[in-house]
Amino acid sequence: MHIFGKILGAFFGLLLGGPFGLLFGLFIGHQFDKARRLSQAGFSTGGFGKGPSQAQRQEEFFKAAFAVMGHVAKAKGQVTKEEIQLATAMMDRMNLHGEQRRAAQDAFREGKESDFPLEDVLVRVKISTAGRFDLLQFFLELQISAAFADGAIHPSERNVLHKIARGLGFSSEQLERRLQMQEAAFRFQHQGGFHGQQQGQYQSSGWQQASQADQLADAYKILDVSPEADGKTVKRAYRKLMNEHHPDKLMAKGLPPEMMNVAKEKSQEIQNAYDLIKKVKGFK
């Protein structure tokens, strides 16, 4: 717990200004504790002079991603084995070793603390990304992916995700839509996806109808379009998502280089869903 500032502020506030001074001292002390906590977690707290460099902004984004991931994992009261495995797998996907891996692990542990300043960290994320929609969306989707570590969203995790979405500037409707997309992506991936199915059932007699229908339904949800959508609508949705998730474009906007592989996997997921719809529906 970080309460040193509150205690000190309350003491001097009461000493110098009575009850009103006590309240003012508590407020000032609280601000001090928040700034100290953010600084210890590796986040810039602003101030005068030059703003953070690109490398510093990327570092903030990186640490915040793992810290908030830890906060989501702790939402149910206890971090599960699956959630720890997902965080470890995420570090593996990013090829994190040595200092980088330790920084990610430290941030994840920081996020699990009961007094983790979620709202303040999200403010820092918005500042470090200059409010760029694509980067904020990537950050939110990363947290959603973490919440799906065990294949389902717990109500407590959903509540935390709503706080994260609001803090980043997304509406509840936008979050729920992304939750549906991620749930479909989770099923799509664990069923082998389009290219995985091509290697097996589809080679000779095709998929079983139920399997094909489920895969196709998930592919439409990944692209966030209706199953009744025509080819032009599907292609437009595909291009929009690819433009928002293109790894090179995200890197140019400030995505940490360590997260490039995760961005590539997301764009491949979108590509696979589009390829499946084209194959089954005969779109060109």
From Swiss-Prot:
The keyword Ribosomal protein does not apply. It is a single-pass type III membrane protein. The chain crosses the membrane at residues 7-30. Residues 1-6 are periplasmic. Its main location: membrane. The keyword Lipid metabolism does not apply. Residues 218-284 form the J domain. Pfam families: DnaJ, TerB. Signal peptide: none annotated. Homodimer. The transmembrane domain is a dimerization domain. HAMAP family: DjlA (MF_01153). Regulatory DnaK co-chaperone. Direct interaction between DnaK and DjlA is needed for the induction of the wcaABCDE operon, involved in the synthesis of a colanic acid polysaccharide capsule, possibly through activation of the RcsB/RcsC phosphotransfer signaling pathway. The colanic acid capsule may help the bacterium survive conditions outside the host. This is Co-chaperone protein DjlA. It comes from Vibrio parahaemolyticus serotype O3:K6 (strain RIMD 2210633). The gene is djlA.
